[in-house]
């Protein structure tokens, strides 16, 4: 059983990332800790004027094979694995001295292989062998040994040594052990994922398959959640080991109640939708569907237009902006409606001051970032569906006019706006829009024509005029009924993928009603 506190008398330091190394080494030497080290780490410590003993001197074997073999030795691993109260006699017989602290980080395999021009040879040379072996030895023996794998751990480690007269607690040794095993698992997963994706080992810079033969995923828990999608379900939020800049997982919560499972799911839908717009935009989401989207001169204009689409559904919604939220807009929102979550890349001080009057409102800050998720995944029974993320945009030059009447410039602008929104609406998705704002949204229906009717109904309930609006459909119309319903509501132009067996009938219907229609050749199903 581990003693509560154990002294640190001997430490082995071997790091690729030398951040904080000298300060750590100096603090250990000040506590009369003997330092062992290897290669470049030993040189850095020695150059700082600190005493250090090379591992080669300890083992009697030089580093060999270009550094591939330097710590794989019983005098090293015995010093890490030796058990207090069990192995002292064996250690004494073979001249093995205990090592109480291991400070080690691994060859930078992840950063090297992240480079587009990384060769297979470079990748292989950055696979650490001795490092993970030592980490596992030290972490296994947490009853007697402490192990640090990250410069971010040094401050706490030194603070505990200071507070406990050069000793480390069992609780900290165990926590550091868990972190070390996690790091080894992450490292091995990165190697496995890279090699599994190599399509041809004969290529110098190998082509990598987007869907390797095996996937090893690592996620870090951000927080426990009050419950899952429903109160009888438990839940937690995890983020990628290396989150993409600008995505939801990089958020900072500035105020408000703890986030729920549904808050995060809705926030992701709102943020991904709003960040695709260049002009100031507001997206209001309810149950992962946009219920109001608009572009304006400023945040306030965009909010007023987005809210007007569906004031009823906006109640208790998630609001996202792609600009710094100003105080006037924050006041207008919080005075008018109940809000679950506010999201923006930043906030004026006055906006945050006013938000404190509604202390339960969750306020999230997500810094701008150009990064996009590369993949989408979905769990099914004992399996995982994986696909490239739907990051496909659309430009005017890609549209095909298929009707007798071509859309006007104003209609084209609205068609592209509606198309962007439809991408984030659950299928079957229909979006009515005019002047860069939504007029009505029909979401999640099993029949496309019913989604079209719901969009018209929503517009009517909000007292918005459909006449002169455009319609976007996330997938093709299998029959002409959706076009007939849209025309009856006052729609003037349509954007859809095309590709139906009855495209001819659908185009004829549009011509009969005098509608302009364009095909994108791209579908945006969302389930």
Curated annotation (Swiss-Prot):
GO terms for molecular function: IMP cyclohydrolase activity; phosphoribosylaminoimidazolecarboxamide formyltransferase activity. Its EC number is 2.1.2.3, 3.5.4.10. One of its GO terms (cellular component) is cytosol. SUPFAM superfamilies: Cytidine deaminase-like, Methylglyoxal synthase-like. PROSITE patterns: MGS. It catalyses: (6R)-10-formyltetrahydrofolate + 5-amino-1-(5-phospho-beta-D-ribosyl)imidazole-4-carboxamide = 5-formamido-1-(5-phospho-D-ribosyl)imidazole-4-carboxamide + (6S)-5,6,7,8-tetrahydrofolate; IMP + H2O = 5-formamido-1-(5-phospho-D-ribosyl)imidazole-4-carboxamide. SMART domains: AICARFT_IMPCHas, MGS. Residues 1-149 form the MGS-like domain. The IMP cyclohydrolase activity resides in the N-terminal region. This is Bifunctional purine biosynthesis protein PurH.
